[in-house]
Amino acid sequence: MIIKARHHWFFYWFFRKYSNWLPRLDFREIVLHTQLEDKGLPVLMIGNHFSWWDGFLAEYVNRRLFDRKYHVMMLEEQLRTRMFLNKTGAYSIRKGDRSMLETFRYSAELLGDPRNVVVMFPQGLIHSQHDHQIVFERGWYRMMDKVENPVQM
């Protein structure tokens, strides 16, 4: 059984504010160069996982470009040690377990609602940003077979 996202109004509100404020402390400037347009579809954000900043920066991009309800897939063992993240939109995946199928079904369900953004880091673990080869875990793309509507990626 997976741990589903349970947005709590205060934790989610705080996370959104914190994700907007925190990068400004450590980065001189954040510039989004994009010609991406919001098509009004649910959004799937896929990225390489190179730092603990990734989730915050994904929410920062979400706020600037899409302003959807944030959901992020996390390894269950990491989520269990930081359960407050569940209240900000984190849900679990357990690598190598049959419950992965349930996680993919849940992700597809989230992507059925155009008000949602789903963030995933298919590398599984944090890797150096200097790695020249980015390798995603196998199977994550099967989730898309379960999505019945168009999705913006």
Name each region found by the language model.
Residues L25-M153:
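Soluble catalytic domains of membrane acyltransferases
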Residues M1-D26, R80-T88:
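Alpha-helical membrane-targeting segments
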